[in-house]
Amino acid sequence: MVLDGFAAHFDAYLENIVREGKSEHTVAAYRRDLEELFALLAQMPSEAEGGVPQGLSRRDFTAALRRLSQRGLNARTLARKLSSWRQYCVWLVERGLLHTDPTADIKPPKQPERVPKALPQEWLNRMLDLPVDGGDPLAVRDHALFELMYGSGLRVSEIHGLNADDVYLDEAWVHVTGKGRKQRQVPLTGKSVEALKNYLPLRQTASDGKALFTGRNGTRLSQRQIQKRLAQWAAQNGDGRHVSPHMMRHSYAGHLLQASRDIRAVQELLGHSSLSTTQIYTKLDFDHIARLYDEAHPRAKRQDE
């Protein structure tokens, strides 16, 4: 069966990307995407015969994408899945296990431009300036976590992966391992340094003692736990609005761009490999400028106001 030949090297491929240093989260995502692809291809009649993967065609992969689209998956998710499939096909071609990449000329679904949601700067300042119960280690930890999240614009995966020795309080910077294991240094705000100094003496540690943010049992906080703590904090102290780590990162980027106008510096701080990824925040900046214009310029007001 054609599919058997195509899927036969699946485990070897996963072992290879583990050796390349991909994170557990990335490897798990590749596994899910490829297992889903194999299941979809198994439901399709193939024109080829024999036990080699050569018979799979572009048509098979576009049909798989179409079925996922019919299930309601959005363009962004479909594009990510196609990327996972393509990387597997390229790996097979490079090793002589596949003559050509059947996904090579498949264009990913066009994604609508999404402007990130940023939280109001005044709201964030008010929330982060709320009194912290110094007798509650979890409250002190969460305050340091949220200050770092907004003050340095880290991804939730990056915060999850931080170790205590990644933080340099005297120099006011943090060593971050980002996507693709890329390393960068990000400055710490004065508020973050103060919050971390309050938290570190109270930090619970397990046997290895490495993780920066830990739970009561001393083990590293999971990404889901970080998301949950942030949502609970916002719900209990805010005005009912939904808050996520991604929104905190978007707020950091948008507010920094408004203040600095230096998109290259913001790109470096965010750990974006491509400037085009950072450029979406210029839309946030334009919205801010447009509001100021409407409020301040005498010719911007409508006649009926």
Curated annotation (Swiss-Prot):
Q: Where is the Core-binding (CB) domain?
A: 1-93
**SUPFAM superfamilies, from UniProt?**
DNA breaking-rejoining enzymes (SSF56349)
- Which organism encodes this protein? Neisseria meningitidis serogroup C (strain 053442)
Q: Name one GO molecular function term.
A: tyrosine-based site-specific recombinase activity
Q: Which GO terms describe its biological process?
A: cell division; chromosome segregation; DNA transposition
Protein purpose? Site-specific tyrosine recombinase, which acts by catalyzing the cutting and rejoining of the recombining DNA molecules. The XerC-XerD complex is essential to convert dimers of the bacterial chromosome into monomers to permit their segregation at cell division. It also contributes to the segregational stability of plasmids.
Q: Where is the active site?
A: 155, 179, 246, 249, 272, 281 (o-(3'-phospho-dna)-tyrosine intermediate)
Record lineage:
Bacteria, Pseudomonadati, Pseudomonadota, Betaproteobacteria, Neisseriales
Q: Which UniProt keywords apply?
A: Cell cycle, Cell division, Chromosome partition, Cytoplasm, DNA integration, DNA recombination, DNA-binding
Task: Please name the CDD domains in this protein's record.
Answer: INT_XerDC_C
Q: Does the keyword Cell cycle apply?
A: yes
Name the family: Belongs to the 'phage' integrase family. XerC subfamily.
A Pfam family hit = Phage_int_SAM_1
Which residue ranges does the record assign to the Tyr recombinase domain? 114-294
GO cellular component terms, alphabetically, are:
cytoplasm
Localisation per UniProt entry: Cytoplasm
This one is known as: Tyrosine recombinase XerC
